[in-house]
Amino acid sequence: MSEFGAGAELPGWVTESRSRGEFFSPEESHAAAPAGFLQELPSYRSVLWRRAAAGDVQERWGNLRGIASAERREPQPDGGERGAIPLWELPFSIAEKRDSQQGDIKYSSGWNHWKRTSSKSWKKALKDIKELSSYMQLWRHDIHSIEGKFGTGIQSYFSFLRFLVLLNFLMFILMFSFVTLPAVISNYGIFNSSSTKISPNNTEPYCTVYTPSGNKGLVYFYTYLKDLLTGTGFLEVTVLFYGYYTIDAAWFSVLRYNLPLAYLLTTFAYLALSFVWIIKRSVERFRQHLVDDEDQFQSYCNKVFAGWDFCITDLNAARLKHRSLLYELQTNLEEERLKQKIAERTMKEKLQIYSLRIFINIIVIAVLSGCFYSIYRATVFSQENSSVSIRRNVMIANLLVQYLPSIVITSANFIAPQIFSFLIRFEDYSAAFEIRLTLIRCVFVRLANVGVLLFSLWSQIHCDNDQCKACGYDYELYPCWESAVGQEMYKLLIFDFMIIIAMTLFVDFPRKLLVTYCSWKLVQWWGLQEFGISDNVLEIIYGQTICWIGTFFSPLLPAIATIKYFIIFYIKKISLIHTRKPASRPIRASSSNFFFLAVLLIGLILAFVPLGVSIALISSSKACGPFRNFNTSWAIVPYTILEFPIGLQKFLYGIASEAFAVPFFVIACLFMFYFIALAGAHKRVVEQLREQLVTESRDKLFLLEKLSEAQKNSGKPQKARKLTSSWLLEPLDKG
């Protein structure tokens, strides 16, 4: 019986070489070699792994196992373990490793034994929690089903949507726990609580006048519907908007809760939470993106030879996995085809395509400029004429005037991406790059549209004439301007949700019915619509940016966004399965996931700008809100610091001073440059090692060719066989 396995027959040249002493064998004097050298040999590990089928191997190698076991179990002077060779790296069976572990425990001290036991218990508990959380993951089965039917690119969109649902839910928990709940409890005197309201000092009386247009007396039903859509009327005086939180402090028995400070710190908290979570997920996806893009040939090998999960026992799961691998291979082949096409372009073709791209980008800039100007004019018209419509009590006209900015923004968000999607077909990019470029262009449309809207509002809120000097803002048009901004964000969020539902019900499903039951050539040429990943991603990134900006002005906006995205998931899933078709050009999920998060991070960074301006520069409303006694919302921070002890005040002011900030910035830059240089050095070392591996593999192939030629020419293969056997069994530590 051979040590290569039961019933395995060795080739004749190996048997002949063994009889002549030209072949390395475990039963020879080499067994006395050091254990470390023998354990590096792949033949040694293979033989031990198969010792259950080859009983004579255990006897031949028993002395070597004894040496290794003795070295492993040898007690140390401090009573600890011998940590030179980790137990899991030894080529022993589970029973032998367990015996070795028990021997280590026998010689270990009580402290080491407790530390080992607690560490194992903690790791096991973490593993169980991780497995349980994976089974309890939201929409786990639905997303796996989508991945199998439509590929990993579309699956990445639904995973991204799930992430936003969880993020908004955590934002809602923060705002509700630290802002809404204390305000409601103190206003209603629950749990022996009370609230304190201090009238603003050194403020003109007319600046403190705020009479919300709440519904009083008998009103028509459509009035409630209008208020529900616009955030005015009965909604304006609820916990949904900034104006409700007109509290300076909440008292719970003898404990004072500083609501203005909590309001500001919670705003910073949800922004920091979003930033850290997005960065964490971006790093994970970027690492996977680098691995997938490192070597396409290696990716093919991994998918073909190691892509299948042999733990799958369900037939449906097997079909989904099969389709997922098929889409991934199609994506790789499509990328290789495009790379080959780009490499074969002539100079004339390159000049043509570059000229066409420049012309298309000029058209894109013109479309963007038209969108921005339309939004600015619509916002100014809406703010100037909404009060006129209210006085005339014309319900439809008032609703249209108030929703005019939202209608124009949504129209621009719908028309501009359609133009960009049509133009990008002529630019001849890859499927993945088409999505990225379309996303970037649509980001400028959607997010810049929100910026133009806010700029239009602030240009009217913060005016420079004599009317605004007394209060710092236009108190006649905006007595509580924070609630007005919150209402605009609320209308954008609601209107965007209504458009998504309307497009699914009145465009996607009728198109599906026409294509299915109408045999006209024009209808069949029109066909089913593909699931546009870039458009759908921009929809939710646009809504999330609105939520980040509007949460400061409407603390419960994350709850609305959570419900909105939860419903959108099922709407998009039903639309995808019943009315859409898979993309004709598959895309890679790893690059999509990373780029989606990168665009979302851009939206978050852009949200910092209007929030920073509102908190630090624009005067806070004197008639409503927790900051009515301060010039700006940020003024609560230095006011709170003045209540600290003198030593702590000096320390905080020292940290905020330029004397500390400049050296800290320089040191941070030095550390950043150091880690960048270190990463570059590691990358160069990895490239050198990869080149070395490729060179060694070529050398070995060259040697094999030479040995084959020597065998054919000499007719005496014994010497070649000797060289071959010694080369095959040399240590692989160089590789």
From Swiss-Prot:
It holds the Pfam family TMC. It is a multi-pass membrane protein. Residues 710-735 are annotated as: Disordered. InterPro entries: TMC (IPR038900), TMC_dom (IPR012496). It is found in: Membrane. GO terms for biological process: sensory perception of mechanical stimulus. Residues 1-164, 255-258, 377-403, 458-488, 570-594, 656-658 are extracellular. GO terms for molecular function: mechanosensitive monoatomic ion channel activity. Keywords: Glycoprotein, Membrane, Transmembrane, Transmembrane helix. The chain crosses the membrane at residues 165-185, 234-254, 259-279, 356-376, 404-424, 437-457, 489-509, 549-569, 595-615, 635-655, 659-679. The keyword Lyase does not apply. The keyword Transferase does not apply. GO terms for cellular component: plasma membrane. Glycans are attached at N385. Residues 186-233, 280-355, 425-436, 510-548, 616-634, 680-735 are cytoplasmic. PANTHER family: TRANSMEMBRANE CHANNEL-LIKE PROTEIN 7, TRANSMEMBRANE CHANNEL-RELATED. Belongs to the TMC family. Probable component of an ion channel. This is Transmembrane channel-like protein 7. It comes from Gallus gallus (Chicken). The lineage of its organism: Eukaryota, Metazoa, Chordata, Craniata, Vertebrata. The gene is Tmc7.
